[in-house]
Amino acid sequence: SAGNYRRMTLQSAKIDEFDAFDLKIEKSADPFTLAHKRLEGATHPKILCGTTPRIKGLSHIEKRENAAEARLNYRSTCPHCQVEHPLMWGGGHVAWGFKWDREDPEGTVRHHCPHCRGAITQADYLAHWAGGVWVSDCGNYRCHYVPGSGPDGRDDYYWTDGAGMRLLRPPRHVAVHIWTAYSPQTTWAAIVRQFLQCVAAKVAGDKAPLEGFINETLGET
């Protein structure tokens, strides 16, 4: 409730399943505004919002993403052309992204580079994904994750600009997009299987499974 928000004073706040919240909390304000107000006076205020995105135009996380100083996705180097790129679903209208043979979709799924169209399997990707970097859409920010490089052997990270120069001030507000294909716990074959089932359901008149695929699997509104 709005009263619960007002009773808290925090150093940091985390909002899970952000898009499941009402647009306004008890006709007071949106959940982000209420949570953010509780951070006033904090020494190092930080607010983290995460969610499965829902309806375009009504999504809390979409609004926060659009307001971000840097919108990041994880990019690894293509083994064919040595150019970085994220994993992207693609589609029938483009030559990059996930492709498969109709005769054996699950056994032939590959991800095609948007630069050289070179194809990789999930095993290929998992063999080199750890060398990737978080890159902003604008290309001005790069976040490098370095396991075990911090104090006491803890994981650490650092920021650079597009030219590789260390940044003294990282962006204050970042948005990160990640979707199911990045997970080593889900096979690309399973994603293709789910997609084909959703398409078949839509052809039969049920659009809900495909809408769920867009939200839950692709992480899009």
Language model features: what each stretch is:
Residues S1-T221:
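Short, flexible loop motifs at catalytic/binding sites
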